[in-house]
Structure formats: C-alpha cells, structure tokens
Curated annotation (Swiss-Prot):
Heme b binds at H152. Keywords: Heme, Iron, Isomerase, Metal-binding. It catalyses: peroxynitrite = nitrate. PANTHER family: PEROXYNITRITE ISOMERASE THAP4, THAP4 PROTEIN. HAMAP family: nitrobindin. It is an enzyme of class 5 (isomerase). Gene3D superfamilies: 2.40.128.20. This is Peroxynitrite isomerase. Belongs to the nitrobindin family. Forms a 10-stranded antiparallel beta-barrel structure able to accommodate a hydrophobic ligand in its interior. In fact, this fold hosts the heme group, which is located in a wide surface cleft. Homodimer. Binds 1 heme b group per subunit, that coordinates a highly solvent-exposed Fe(III) atom.
Length: 161
C-alpha cells in the first residue's frame, strides 16, 4: 500500500494500478458487441482515487468509449464516484463497498445524471465491481432511450504486470 494514501482509502488500495481485459455489451437498441479495455486507478495524495477508462474495438483497435473521474470514501463502507463520459454524459454515483480478505465488492447507483442537449437520453446507471486479488470484474446497468434499467456491460480485467 502506498505510504501517502489517505487513510480513508486504505481499504481500496488493491484497486490501484492498471487493469486490462475484455468485455461484452448488449442493449435492446443495439447489436451485441465485444471490446478491449484498460482501467487505471491512481491517487494524488488527496482523499480520492482517480479513475480513467478506455475501450477499443477488438477487430481494429478503434476507440469506442472513455470516462474519467474520482472515487472517494466519505465514511467506511460508503463510496462516491463522479464521472465524465466522452459521450456528453456526467454522472454521480453513490453506494457501498465491503472488504473480506482479498475480496472487495462495490455497488453503485446514480443519484444524478447530467446530459448536454445533444446527448442520448440516459436516465439511470449502476455499477458493480468485484476485485479478487489480480482480477477485476464488473457489470454496468443502464436505463436509456426509453428502456428501463437493465444489464448493459460485463467485463473481466486483470492487473497489468
């Protein structure tokens, strides 16, 4: 664990670093798809972790999606995530986390979604992270374009060596 990591974040220290892997997406309004992904958690000696995420197409490496944000722990067991997406969406998610040995589980739901006028209508988002040693699995749920909240993305990433 980094010696300069804020004490509130120590339970989440295993997130720090780069994670790479593959994911799959689906939604009623689009064709199912697969993607390559890299997620990076880092810190700036402040009471939050920084988060960046980039995906690209498996077939040609073309960029697909990107987000960046901040994750903080307002009190033990509780977590907040502020994100900006490349697709004209900003979101605030709140939730809980638990740590059992090497296993960290995080569950988040949106409290606020901001959209620019030309963005697709996204009405709800939720995330579940499961970190077990050097494996980071997640799922994302989305409600958008008239569809209810439902499964959208699932991925398994591994710590980049």
């Amino acid at each position: 664990m980094p010696s300069d990591l804020c004490p509130d974040l120590q339970a989440l220290a295993p997130l720090l670093g780069s994670w790479v892997g593959r994911g799959m997406g689906k939604y009623p309004t689009i064709q199912p798809f697969e993607y390559l992904e890299e997620v990076v958690f880092s810190h700036l000696d402040r009471p939050f972790l920084t988060y960046t995420q980039k995906t690209r197409a498996i077939t040609d490496g073309k960029p697909l999606h990107a987000e960046t944000g901040y994750l903080r722990v307002p009190q033990p067991g509780h977590i907040e995530l502020v994100l900006a997406h490349h697709s004209d969406i900003a979101e605030i998610e709140v939730g809980t986390y638990s740590v059992t040995g090497d296993l960290i589980e995080v569950e988040l739901v949106t409290t606020t979604i901001g959209l620019v006028p030309t963005a697709k209508q996204v009405t709800a988002l939720g995330r579940f992270f499961r970190i077990d040693g050097d494996e980071f699995a997640y799922s994302v749920q989305m409600g958008a374009v008239g569809q209810p909240l439902q499964d959208h993305l699932v991925a398994v990433l591994h710590r980049k060596q």
